[in-house]
């Protein structure tokens, strides 16, 4: 995944001066890339990483922040492992390090989510948590229908903590479990760009946005080329008409719109080219296309009734005169 590699290389070079921010990133990397192991009755802290650059960053932070010596070994690609990995291990002082980073609680028990001090830290520390999680277990796919920024988590509690951290950065993320693997996913294009910036991938986000815009232009061009298809033309006309009527309904009803009807109307206006079925998938929680259609019908009917009662132009007043030429 070239994009993932680009992001990780850029993030591995982010310079951080604040000790608390460096510590937040390091603790999250350790939590998401390995964790604690018992070796010869001693607690060892291990971290399996993608690149030698990241391994050097982790070893440098371990030495400078906690004064511990770490070993590194190379795990060659084989079988299910498609690429070479780098294992950083701390044996001497492993338990002390685990306590200092919050991987062990006060009762010497491994934490299940993220250390509390990380999830309640400053905005800069929260961004470092996400940077560490992505460096340890993140992927970024190309812009398009299936675009996603995704982090594989060590468990459900860690996933939920990461979702909460994203919320602190004003980014909407969702946790999901597939075949026992917990992941946190960001799918909205704007949210992906916002998270990349927050983590510090300023260069990569520019490239990602350019790719996204090119894909949108191509998709729009393809739709225009296919407009000769009568079904597509009718769908386009119906979408234009629906949006025009919903906009007029919002004007007529003003603040009197019931929240559930307003939500359906906002969905229609936000995703103007989407079918009713697609609108249902965009809803949170998801709705059936019949539920979406029903709410929009009730919204229009309520607006038209108020328009008649008050002698106002109805929802048809906003329909374009050249609708047949769409």
Swiss-Prot record:
This is Probable cell division protein WhiA. Involved in cell division and chromosome segregation. Belongs to the WhiA family. Keywords: Cell cycle, Cell division, DNA-binding. The keyword GTP-binding does not apply. InterPro entries: Homing_endonucl, Sporu_reg_WhiA_N_dom, Sporulation_regulator_WhiA, Sporulation_regulator_WhiA_C, WhiA_LAGLIDADG_dom. GO terms for molecular function: DNA binding. Residues 275-308 bind DNA. The keyword Cell cycle applies. It comes from Clavibacter sepedonicus. GO terms for biological process: cell division; regulation of sporulation. It comes from the Bacteria. The gene is whiA.
């Amino acid at each position: 995944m070239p994009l993932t590699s680009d992001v990780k290389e850029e993030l591995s070079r982010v310079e951080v001066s604040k000790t608390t921010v460096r510590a937040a990133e390091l603790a999250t990397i350790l939590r998401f890339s390995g964790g604690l192991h018992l070796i010869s009755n001693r607690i060892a802290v291990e971290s399996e990483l993608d690149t030698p650059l990241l391994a050097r960053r982790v070893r440098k932070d371990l030495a400078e922040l906690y004064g511990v010596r770490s070993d590194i070994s190379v795990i060659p690609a084989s079988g299910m492992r498609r690429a070479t990995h780098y294992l950083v291990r701390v044996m001497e002082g492993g338990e002390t390090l685990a306590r200092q980073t919050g991987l062990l609680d006060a009762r010497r028990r491994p934490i299940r989510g993220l250390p509390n001090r990380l999830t309640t830290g400053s905005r800069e520390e929260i961004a470092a948590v996400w940077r560490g999680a992505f460096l340890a277990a993140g992927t970024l796919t190309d812009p398009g229908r299936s675009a996603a920024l995704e982090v594989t988590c060590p468990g459900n509690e860690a996933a939920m903590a990461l979702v909460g951290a994203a919320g602190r950065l004003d980014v909407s993320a969702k946790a999901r479990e597939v075949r026992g693997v917990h992941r946190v996913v960001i799918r909205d294009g704007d949210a992906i760009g916002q998270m990349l910036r927050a983590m510090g991938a300023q260069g990569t986000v520019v490239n990602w946005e350019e790719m996204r815009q090119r894909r949108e232009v191509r998709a729009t061009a393809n739709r225009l080329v296919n407009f000769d298809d009568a079904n597509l033309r009718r769908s386009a006309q119906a979408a234009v008409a629906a949006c025009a009527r919903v906009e007029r309904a919002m004007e007529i009803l003003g603040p009197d719109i019931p929240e559930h009807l307003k939500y359906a109307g906002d969905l229609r206006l936000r995703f103007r080219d989407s079918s009713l079925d697609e609108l249902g998938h965009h809803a949170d929680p998801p709705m059936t296309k019949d539920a979406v259609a029903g709410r929009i019908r009730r919204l229009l009917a309520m607006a038209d009734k108020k328009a008649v009662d008050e002698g106002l132009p109805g929802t048809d007043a906003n329909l374009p005169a050249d609708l047949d030429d769409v």
